[in-house]
Amino acid sequence: MANTPHGGVLKDLIARDAPRHDQLEAEAATLPSIVLTERQLCDLELIMNGGFSPLEGFMNQKDYDGVVAESRLADGNLFSMPITLDASKAVIEQAGLKPGSRVTLRDFRDDRNLAILTIDDIYRPDKEKEAKLVFGGDPEHPAIKYLNTKVEEYYIGGKLEAVNKLNHYDYVGLRYTPAELRIHFDKLGWTRVVAFQTRNPMHRAHRELTVRAARARQANVLIHPVVGLTKPGDIDHFTRVRAYQALLPRYPNGMAALALLPLAMRMGGPREAVWHAIIRKNHGATHFIVGRDHAGPGKNSKGQEFYGPYDAQHAVEKYRAELGIEVVEFQQVTYLPDTDEYMPKDEVPAGTKTLDISGTELRNRLRTGAHIPEWFSYPEVVKILRESSPPRALQGFTIFLTGYMNSGKDAIARALQVTLNQQGGRSVTLLLGDTVRHELSSELGFSREDRHTNVQRIAFVAGELTRAGAAVIAAPIAPYEHSRKAAREAVQSTGGSFFLVHVNTPLEYCEATDKRGIYAKARRGEIKGFTGVDDPYEAPTNANLVVDVSKQSVRSIVHEIILMLESEGYFERL
């Protein structure tokens, strides 16, 4: 028998509201609406299908305050993660929203009406408190960065009525709601289910870990990977799901099943581990594996872990009785070549030879095409990963040149384009500042905001081309550090590499060699907001390469860039 849902009742709003579908659909078309972001869509789906039971909507202030401070809803139920609907003041005022109002929630992907929210309250959260108590307070934490840069200033709380399910076009047969998964377990005759959370590909160690957990508890295994939002830079879920499917036959027949979870992770470590346990309980699992640094975001810029290695295990242990799902705490496992088996590290006899491949080492082997041994992963899994993560020589990249006008960056960009075209192996795209201004940003001016927008448009195009395997050479002035940082993050979020080249040619040289007389016009006041004259240029603090046309030839600079790319593995090595 499947586990009892958290709070006692599965809050399946889709099933509850199905008899009123036509009425709700008609009403939704008449109401003001809010278009949801990708993270909000993930949250909405799991509220509506009961994955976040006992929630029936986005948290009002009482629930939010209780969860932030004590991991408890206003009714006393344990819930460790704030689930909120953020909106800007402009959206709230434009829609005329207030307590008691009803508002339609829409899908940004296809503009469908998904739900109606009856508003309890509209409140301004204490983001600093939320960051500290929920995520630990480190401003480099991805959830805190998201909170401070993406989340709007107001939260809207209230209960939901489901209008339509979200549409998915990928792996539809693996997307079980909690109710559907419970029926699936019943059909299979499973009464004890160990759930395994992952946002990464699974290898032999993961298979051994889950089999050990199931064997010890006479249970079956639910592989329950996240396919919503994970950590930037993670392997895409399409690749991961193919790898999970390839792994399944390696389990004893009938032992394991695969189901996908449309969760937007927060990488919240201890808080997230408790949240994950609640979610798996709602999906019918009786046991849940919590490993080392569960749902942690890794290390900050100083090389420090955001959480202790076993903080998540301590958190779920603290609430073990309330969670109502048996938490399986597992140490890391390691490979013993002499006996060809995996074993938890704390059980390995002293002096025994062990082998491990870290995540960083695996990425390096995929990048370089180096051998990945079968003791680490199965050939069919490695084949899928290599298809989606080709070696660097087959990947795209972005060279982002920044500097004053007439610093020589355009000449460098053109010469580099010719050199890369001669090299062959990938298409090459040139995004010069003037060209982009004319073709993509003709309506933008030269205010700080417009300049930032222009650079982000360049970054978007560069990221998409880089994802497709092209070499992109961008050469805007890009005078602001925050714009360049955002551009780097945008390109890297697509899985591509971003190389910042600071063309550090002195302003005096740029001005003295300006044959078009642009600087002279700026000095006379005929052009306002001109970089280097009456608008600052913020020198990069993290350039991959610094060059100077007043001291170097364009040819030598291009050669430096080529050598940088070669050292990073972007050209075939004989």
UniProtKB/Swiss-Prot annotation:
PANTHER family: SULFATE ADENYLYLTRANSFERASE. Catalyzes the first intracellular reaction of sulfate assimilation, forming adenosine-5'-phosphosulfate (APS) from inorganic sulfate and ATP. Plays an important role in sulfate activation as a component of the biosynthesis pathway of sulfur-containing amino acids. Its main location: cytoplasm. Pathway: Sulfur metabolism; hydrogen sulfide biosynthesis; sulfite from sulfate: step 1/3. InterPro entries: APS_kinase, ATP-Sase_PUA-like_dom, P-loop_NTPase, PUA-like_sf, Rossmann-like_a/b/a_fold, Sulf_adenylyltr_euk, Sulf_AdTrans/APS_kinase, Sulfurylase_cat_dom. Residues 170-394 are annotated as: Catalytic. Keywords: Allosteric enzyme, Amino-acid biosynthesis, ATP-binding, Cysteine biosynthesis, Cytoplasm, Methionine biosynthesis, Nucleotide-binding, Nucleotidyltransferase, Transferase. This is Sulfate adenylyltransferase. One of its GO terms (molecular function) is sulfate adenylyltransferase (ATP) activity. One of its GO terms (biological process) is methionine biosynthetic process. Allosterically inhibited by 3'-phosphoadenosine 5'-phosphosulfate (PAPS). The record marks 330 as: Induces change in substrate recognition on ATP binding. The lineage of its organism: Eukaryota, Fungi, Dikarya, Ascomycota, Pezizomycotina. The keyword Metal-binding does not apply. Its EC number is 2.7.7.4. Residues 1-169 are annotated as: N-terminal. GO terms for cellular component: cytoplasm. It is found in: Cytoplasm. Residues 395-574 are annotated as: Allosteric regulation domain.
